Amino acid sequence: MSSFGTGKTKEVIFSMEEGSVKMFLRGRPVPMLIPDELAPTYSLDTRSELPSSRLKLDWVYGYRGRDCRANLYLLPTGEVVYFVASVAVLYSVEEQRQRHYLGHNDDIKCLAVHPDMVTIATGQVAGTTKEGKPLPPHVRVWDSVSLSTLHVLGLGVFDRAVCCVAFSKSNGGNLLCAVDESNDHVLSVWDWAKESKVVDSKCSNEAVLVATFHPTDPNLLITCGKSHIYFWSLEGGNLSKRQGLFEKHEKPKYVLCVTFLEGGDVVTGDSGGNLYVWGKGGNRITQEVLGAHDGGVFALCALRDGTLVSGGGRDRRVVLWGSDYSKVQEVEVPEDFGPVRTVAEGRGDTLYVGTTRNSILLGSVHTGFSLLVQGHVEELWGLATHPSRAQFVSCGQDKLVHLWSSETHQPVWSRSIEDPARSAGFHPSGSVLAVGTVTGRWLLLDTDTRDLVAIHTDGNEQISVVSFSPDGAYLAVGSHDNLVYVYTVDQGGRKVSRLGKCSGHSSFITHLDWAQDSTCFVTNSGDYEILYWDAATCKQITSADTVRNVQWATATCVLGFGVFGIWPEGADGTDINAVARSHDGNLLVSADDFGKVHLFSYPCCQPRALSHKYGGHSSHVTNVAFLWDDSMVLTTGGKDTSVLQWRVA
């Protein structure tokens, strides 16, 4: 790094007289106070040290069922394979262990398992790098035992995203088909081991939901989607299609799913709730089950014994059909878990069900289904770790609050609230949890019973931070109305009364940290201001010397002397959403808008400090926190709705 004169780099100015460092975000100066003990030896030219610790992805909470299909399978190893964000997850239910394929750099949209039951293909969307360079959509073929990437297909060929992928089922599975999300929804066939495209063809102007090879005829493919089903023949390097004819049957808005029966018949499920059987090799309907489901048929699965299982959307039913298409048995999935998105055969008579509310269930048509993987359904921002247990809370736009065990990886409890949630914080006793919402309402919940303790409203904008003081005597509530509301707290967090409000920011409150002695707190705002506040009087502290040497209990503010090294060159002030310091004071983790989690040494007070960088999230990473004992880091993905748990090693 070049420095000009004493203490000035391109974007940072060090002033010895003022005892401050000034950085610039969008041309706006952000002055930060240097503690007296560091000032005499401080230099901008000191090299930052990489932390000796690393993060390793330990657990992935969530599943993408909301808008993806046919993405849940049981492997012979006993692992179920599925995806969320940019992670393909291999989850051994018996061993309660996950492995992760991390080869993708943005959202995975589709998944297929090769007939060898070891090789997997996953397709992803187009992304962009931090520098704005496009990351092209592609298919990755990988080994589910070693997790090594075998082949990468279609770089520069696919447009927007790969939405469907499948291996051929006969001829050794040496072909792979894929459909992209270009306007023409191009169907392409690949010799995947050679990474060469055999042929492609425009599929449809409308959305394509499924592309699959016939199980016994390697030259026959089927695609279906919005108001169509096509039967494709692959001959002499050409693809020709025949449209499925609905004739006297009502043409459905969507053909949603397809499977094959032992005799070679094709069965489709559609948005009208009907099952149609298409006779072997033909493009005409030979049998029908009208009204098989109330609402769409979202999933079809042919079991090993030849039985057909269907899964319903609106009616949330899983139905077992006899060989004559009479209902043999049916069971309803509980409403909280949502409509069925995909069904996969397990061991014995068990089934795995993925739902549109991003849950995975395990059970059978005879016994019903119980929760295996709980997911959030919408954008996720709220995260807080319990002060003395291996637990954390997540809450989001879906109005759900989950208290999780980081050891069992299951919710200890879940509850819905009336408003979309934005922020969370535990009382130091751990017995009460505050949750801030987007409406200005905030709640206190009992951590053990999940009962509502109290509900308050401050302003009518979103509550971006709720934070109890370390001694448990105050609660600070930071709002998008530019104010911080301060409450005194009694009865271990169960009783609060408004003390006053802190007025002085000219933009919304983004982050807040308390002093270790609970006398004051510091805030950051949307226009990159750092202000200090006296808790007892709610007055702004304007004297630099009063706050320069304060020991802060936490480091969640993204602007401040101890953390400013997290900002990359040319950063926009909104590029980093959250930061957290380990309780032992040695590590700092940041969450950015580019799907990355960075691990720094603390304090992080050299410009553009060195970090270890980790992918896994696919959209902006919205929040980050250390577990109470610093053994794990938790991160939340915004639109990818996932929570990732990282082991600190």
Curated annotation (Swiss-Prot):
Lineage: Eukaryota, Metazoa, Chordata, Craniata, Vertebrata
Domains: entry comment: Contains a tandem atypical propeller in EMLs (TAPE) domain. The N-terminal beta-propeller is formed by canonical WD repeats; in contrast, the second beta-propeller contains one blade that is formed by discontinuous parts of the polypeptide chain.
Protein purpose: Tubulin binding protein that inhibits microtubule nucleation and growth, resulting in shorter microtubules.
Top-level taxon of the source organism: Eukaryota
One Gene Ontology CC term in the entry: cytoplasm
Location (main, coarse): cytoplasm
SUPFAM superfamilies, alphabetized: Quinoprotein alcohol dehydrogenase-like, Soluble quinoprotein glucose dehydrogenase
Alphabetized UniProt keyword annotations: Cytoplasm, Cytoskeleton, Microtubule, Repeat, WD repeat
InterPro entries registered for this protein in UniProt: Beta-prop_EML-like_2nd, Beta-prop_EML_1st, HELP, Quinoprot_gluc/sorb_DH_b-prop, Quinoprotein_ADH-like_sf, WD40/YVTN_repeat-like_dom_sf, WD40_rpt, WD_repeat_EMAP
Stretches for region Tandem atypical propeller in EMLs: 10-649
Protein name: Echinoderm microtubule-associated protein-like 2
Protein family membership: Belongs to the WD repeat EMAP family.
Known tissue expression: Widely expressed in both brain and peripheral tissues, including brainstem and enrichment in the postsynaptic density, PSD.
Molecular function in Gene Ontology: ionotropic glutamate receptor binding; microtubule binding; tubulin binding
Oligomer and partners: Interacts with GRID2 and may also interact with GRID1. Interacts with EML3. Binds unpolymerized tubulins via its WD repeat region.
GO biological process: one example: regulation of microtubule nucleation
Annotated WD repeat ranges: 56-93, 97-144, 151-192, 195-234, 241-280, 285-323, 369-406, 410-447, 452-489, 495-535, 564-602, 609-648
Localisation per UniProt entry: Cytoplasm, Cytoskeleton; Cytoplasm, Cytoskeleton, Spindle
Record Gene3D superfamilies: YVTN repeat-like/Quinoprotein amine dehydrogenase (2.130.10.10)
